[in-house]
Amino acid sequence: MLYIVPTPVGNLEDITFRALRVLKEVDLILAEDTRTSSVLLKHYDIHTPLKSHHKFNEHETSDDMAERIAAGMTVALISDAGTPCISDPGFMLVRACVERGVEVQCLPGATAFVPALVNSGLPNDRFYFEGFLPQKKGRQTRMKILAEQTHTMIIYESPFRLVKTLEQLAEYMGADRRASVSREISKLHEDTQRGTLAELANHYKQTPPKGEIVLIVEGANS
């Protein structure tokens, strides 16, 4: 059995009783970064063996791990924060398990974009998840496509690229397109700023952002 286990995006209390039980009972935990995950596991007195599974090794390890799970091992997959496979490693392992007929269970739990979307004040009955934009090749093409998207858009971004992204989106979508920026979700300094793309770009030029960021942008003709 492979369990996909969401972990807190900020506050360590944002984890379910079921997730804690699974992490204690499985034979092995696969973690995106064992150092980061060790903090959570130590906090909850979980001593299950831990092994790295990240974007740099999942191409080589997913098939072997799926074979071990098929042979009877129970494994939990976690990421540094939030739900694995959502802009995080895990898809290749899930696919390898599915191809072998291995049962996969994804537990419900934390993910950063849901509170950011709800807090944005923008329409959320339909939305489009973009995740991380390309940093170089294909970036302008994605911007053009997003400019025509009619549903509210969800974009993950680095604090170091946020101003550039806001300025580029304003260029393709118009400076008056409404948006929100949520950062440090569920952490001590959680913050959401709302305004137009131009206003937000100007704000973060003057106040450089820190922490993990979710950008929500209203759809065309909203």
How should each PLM-predicted stretch be described?
Residues T152, Y156-S222:
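A contiguous loop/helix-start segment that scaffolds small-molecule binding in enzyme catalytic cores
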Residues L23-I29, G101-V104, T152-M153:
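Short active-site oxyanion
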